[in-house]
Design a protein with these regions (language model features):
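Symmetry-related core transmembrane helices of the 12-TM Major Facilitator Superfamily/SLC fold
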Residues: 163-180, 377-395
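Helix-loop-helix hairpin linking two adjacent transmembrane segments in secondary transporters
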Residues: 137-181
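Juxtamembrane intracellular "pre-TM" segments in multi-pass secondary transporters
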Residues: 1-2, 186-214
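Conserved MFS/SLC helix-loop-helix module at the cytosolic interface between two early adjacent transmembrane helices
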Residues: 57-93
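Cytoplasmic membrane-interface "Motif A"-like loop-to-helix N-cap segments
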Residues: 68-78, 276-287
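Cytoplasmic helix-loop-helix junction between adjacent transmembrane helices
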Residues: 102-140
Length: 413
């Protein structure tokens, strides 16, 4: 299979679907887990935060290692480790502490497959198609999350969270096998660094790169907080209309899966638009719409569920739409020898912020009692504030004279 071809990209995207089904396992079953594991909202958010922090550390380490030994090699090791840890999590996560430890270890394994996958796409897909290719790659992530949420919605009412965990853990095993088959013959590229070239000059003093990283950091705060708590919020909306908790959790997972489907569509569409219109205009449009949704969404508890779901679909579309463009942009404003290092810093900042978001969100819920529209409203506002900072970062990027490469279209309209 020719690296960079349509068939190669399709296969690596499908492997992404399976690999990331386990990513949302905890959030999808959270309403049931809070009761079964006797967790407060703060404790529940703590598990999500530890996952994101471990994921950030893994992304940083694996990205830096990829610069030195090649992205292909690190990607393959990450897929194998992810399959093993997914199976262990599904089999042995049965209370707060086992869930915390195993979910954190799972995050360390999954981190080996994300930025290394981004690097593989950047290395093998021509620049004129890179935006849409990155969009399709990240769309595989969203499809995996949607599939996992749908499976969880079926499983929790039939076999509880253990059955849900077992079903979604099959994804990294199948996805890992597909990834191994596709990527094993892809060249392992190691770009040597020119003498005198240093990280500080290539990244830290690179204004467009740092503004992209700043935008991505607060985008991640908003997105990962939203992903962590939207299934529970939708479950609360169903419970508020009279559903039992288990049924509400299942319905919430179903509806959250649709949110991720719109995110998948956004990734693909935004990638195409970014190639045609330029990276910055599409980032600004998506970030602005997502911020508005964050500021409104939580206050809808108690309104008709159809209204909540409708806005949730728009929210899911906008919140993820700019993600592949940030990933593409950072590879275009940093010299190839330092792409991994730049992605490492981006990942540490973004997923570090994403680790804080669920914990702060849960703390706000506890502060306001956890059940009212006021509690959910202010919790989602905390995500909207981060989204607003992302918008400001993109506006500053649009005014940077050395960021012109991100303004122009890559293909003819």
């Amino acid at each position: 299979m020719t690296p960079g071809s349509g068939a190669w990209l399709l296969a690596i995207c499908l492997s992404r679907v399976g690999a990331y089904m386990i990513y949302i396992a905890y959030a999808a079953a959270l309403p049931v887990l809070q009761r079964a594991w006797h967790m407060s909202a703060t404790a529940a958010g703590g598990i999500g935060s530890c996952f994101q922090l471990a994921y950030a550390i893994s992304l940083m380490g694996c990205s830096e290692i990829a610069d030195r030994v090649g992205a292909q090699r690190v990607f393959l090791i990450g897929t194998l480790a992810s399959a093993i840890m997914a199976a262990l999590f599904a089999a042995f996560a049965r209370d707060y502490w086992s869930g915390l430890v195993l979910y954190t270890l799972l995050a360390l394994a999954l981190g080996g497959t994300y930025t290394t996958g981004v690097l593989l796409v950047a290395e093998n897909v021509p620049v004129a198609r890179r935006g849409r290719a990155m969009g399709f790659f990240l769309a595989g992530h969203s499809l995996g999350l949607a599939f996992a949420l749908a499976l969880t919605g079926v499983a929790v009412s039939r076999g509880g969270y253990p059955l849900a965990f077992a079903l979604v853990a099959s994804g990294p095993i199948v996805g890992g096998a597909l990834a191994w088959w596709v990527v094993r013959d892809t060249p392992n590229v190691v770009t040597s660094r020119a003498g005198g070239e240093r990280f500080a000059g290539a990244v830290l003093r690179n204004r467009p790169a740092m503004l992209v990283i700043a935008g991505y950091t607060f985008h991640s705060w908003e997105l990962l907080g939203m992903w962590a708590w939207t299934p529970a919020f939708l479950a609360a909306c169903f419970v508020a209309t009279g559903s039992a908790l288990d049924r509400g959790a299942g319905l919430g997972a179903y509806m959250a899966s649709l949110v991720h489907v719109t995110g998948m569509l956004a990734s693909m569409l935004a990638g195409v638009l970014a190639d045609r219109l330029g990276r910055i205009p599409v980032m600004l449009m998506m970030a602005s719409l997502s911020t508005v949704c964050s500021l409104v969404f939580g206050w809808l508890l108690g309104t008709p569920v159809a209204v909540v779901v409708a806005l949730g679909l728009v929210y899911g579309f906008a919140a993820l739409g700019d993600s592949p463009i940030y990933s593409t942009a950072i590879t275009e404003v940093v010299t190839p020898a330092f792409r991994g290092a730049a992605l490492a810093l981006r990942s540490l900042a973004g997923y570090g912020a994403g680790a804080i978001a669920p914990l702060l969100f849960g703390a706000i819920l506890d502060w306001y009692g956890g059940h009212s529209a006021e509690a959910w409203g202010w919790a989602f506002v905390s995500l909207g504030v981060a989204g607003l900072v992302a918008v400001v970062s993109v506006l500053m990027l649009s005014r940077a004279p050395d960021a012109h490469v991100l303004q122009r279209a890559r293909v003819e309209s």
